[in-house]
Amino acid sequence: MRATTTFLFCAVFLWGTASFGNPASDADEVKSEFLYSWHAYEQYAWGHDELRPLSKTPRDWYGDSLLMTPVDALDTMLIMGLNDEAMKAKTLIVEKLSFDKNLDVKVFEVTIRLLGGLLSSYEMTGDARLLHLAEDLGNRLLPAFNSPTGMPYMFVNLRTGKASGAKSNPAEIGTLILEFGTLSRLTHQPVYFEKAKHALEELYKRRSKIGLVGDEINVETGEWVSTTSHVGGGIDSYLEYQLKCGLLFHDRECRSMWRHSISAVNRYLADGQWYGEADMNTGKRTATEFGALHAFLPAALALGGQLERAQLLEDSCFRMWKRHGIEPEVIDYKTMEVKSPGYQLRPEIIESAYYLYESTHDKRYVDMGHVFFDNLKKWCRTDDGYTTLKSVVTKEKGDLMPSYFLAETLKYLYLLFDGRALEFHKVIFNTEAHPLTH
């Protein structure tokens, strides 16, 4: 393994001063809430994947911990300047994290959370032990690509390499190239990028004649299981990674994929100031549903230079949020009826506000951030960290603080309130908000 030296990565984070108000106080409050949440994890779930705040118990995804929260949260600590907490988390990771476990893991989830988190933290710290862990994980995930099409199976056993789960979706197949490509760049081993790029290309070439994809496909046969197209969970980050692959790796094919894909999405899925569902083959509208996961799209549109569309859609997302004082998982945008009432501490609407502020410097996106933050504190804060909501209508609490709350939700709020912490145009965020260098 030959690592490139990116140890000065943190130096590019400090820049300029904010142009309005007192961003330091807002960002410091977010930092305080991060610490509040992290200390709850330390007290009740240390060494485990996630915290259940109400029951004060840990949760492990697969029966044995892969340190999801520490790995996911480490680069947030580094960005926030929480050096003591970062050192403690990094020590836990390098001393205790092992992937030599008989666990069938979801390739997508461990890639965006663990591989992405290890790579970004390595780039920030220069600690080669983090890159070694990333390379070990990458090697253990490679057997997932051994399908007849080259599109990865949904699960792989970390110890045996046995892959399973032939029915997958575009997001799980196409949201690997940033992490695997970065691993190739840092280790000078092209196999990771090649496997992920081939999978993305195989999926893309199965788009319909009008340029849309469905939301379920068999990776062994290459046949679509569901022809429903949308921009929500199951398809979302497939689109996002086409754009970001083109930007991060200057990849012509990825750029072309994004241009053609987003053109089809805008033509057939856009519905006024919303994006709905349609049949991938005919473009016929099949549903008028939109939700928390769909709210990634304004960020992608802004990054892709389609600012007007991005701004209109973020305004729609904000209306969805304000209707109940926090966003539901899914609504019918024609009736504004809640279809799925939970709130999972998701970051996407905040991510989009951050991207739009960086793209326009319009203070209203910071004002949106204040609404998001105030509502989070009002409805999701517990005596021990933050938790999901079972219903945004009744505000009944769930009992989980997902690792992405520390990796994404609070990170994007912090960066929205204090752009000095990171130079936006020098990094590309993976879909778990782990910044990777150009």
Language-model features: where?
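Bacterial N-terminal signal peptides
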Residues: 7-16
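Positively charged n-region of N-terminal signal peptides that target proteins for export
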Residues: 1-5
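Glycan-recognition and catalytic cores of secretory/periplasmic carbohydrate-active enzymes
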Residues: 20-438
